[in-house]
Amino acid sequence: PDFGHVLIMDEKSFIIQPNPDAPGLSVSVDGVDATGAAVNLPVVTEKPVTLFLNKQEIVTSMTLGDWVAELAVGYFLNQNMLALDDEIIGIDHDEELGVVIVRTAHETNFEAKMKRKIRTSGCAEGTAYGDMMERFDDIKLDLSVKFHASWLVSLSKAINTAPSLYLSAGAIHGCVLCHQHRPLVSREDIGRHNAVDKIAGWMFLNKTPPQDKIFYTTGRLTTEMVIKTVQMQIPVLVSRSGFTAEAVDLARRAGLTLIGRAKGKRFIALSGIDRIVFDSGDDDEFADAPSMQRARLSLIHISEPTRRIT
């Protein structure tokens, strides 16, 4: 199915952007509004997909049902069940059974790992495993990479105005892989953890280097979002939503630039501030605010010691 459009237009275009009209992603449902008037509403679908790594069943996830190969690969990567140097020799998808099997060149056995299952705060009941943090402190994010505040305006406009299932039906989260001011690949799902995994899978399958990328999400900045972004080795995480304190602690521990409440030229950064180049300027949006207030609108820096999470 044509779940997304591949675009080769100009430097501001997506490489791949959502196709909200793809078959099977939503259905039309009749109902009434608050006045009793008849309405017909597009509603997103939910499908169970069971992921296998070689011969072992790992998890069943409720998902939108698109890009399931990317979803499976990204999930296994973010759960430390696949390594970046692992060789995938095949991916099988049985749409009727709702099964995806990822086959690797070497044998795998995660029976012990699966006993340490943790339910996350992600929509659609995300699942993590107790040793998900085992590689976290070993990952070194590139400190030389800069994030220009001016890029955020272009990114936000391109992302928020692009066709998407969120705009047509709602009840969905989106994640976008970006480079500087340009959005590259967009993925959506009913759970933000699924959307993240789809991006991780796409990067692995397309051998995309992460060091100079930006990760944009519509969801909350939680520990799961921070952990997965760090494991993907992307140095900047941006959201139009807010933070949890534990996510901020983890971002600082990893040296991740964490930016939330992003809207237009306004944002709040709580970690990795040294990467930010404040080049957006003082335009009409901030013209009526004193200089110190303008600085606060764009940046909040918490100087209190952070807590360690183990």
Ranges and model annotations:
Residues 1-8:
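Short, Lys/Arg-enriched N-terminal segments with co-localized hydrophobic residues
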Residues 271-299:
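C-terminal domain-closing interface element
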Residues 10-174, 178-179, 184-186:
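Intrinsically disordered, low-complexity regions enriched in acidic/Ser/Thr/Pro/Gln residues
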Residues 192-281:
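Feature captures the catalytic cores and cofactor-binding loops of soluble hydro-lyases/lyases
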Residues 66, 191-192:
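A short acidic/small-residue loop/turn micro-motif
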Residues 300-310:
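Single conserved hydrophobic/aromatic residue that forms the stacking wall/gate
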Residues 173, 193, 301:
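Histidine-centered active-site/metal-ligand motif
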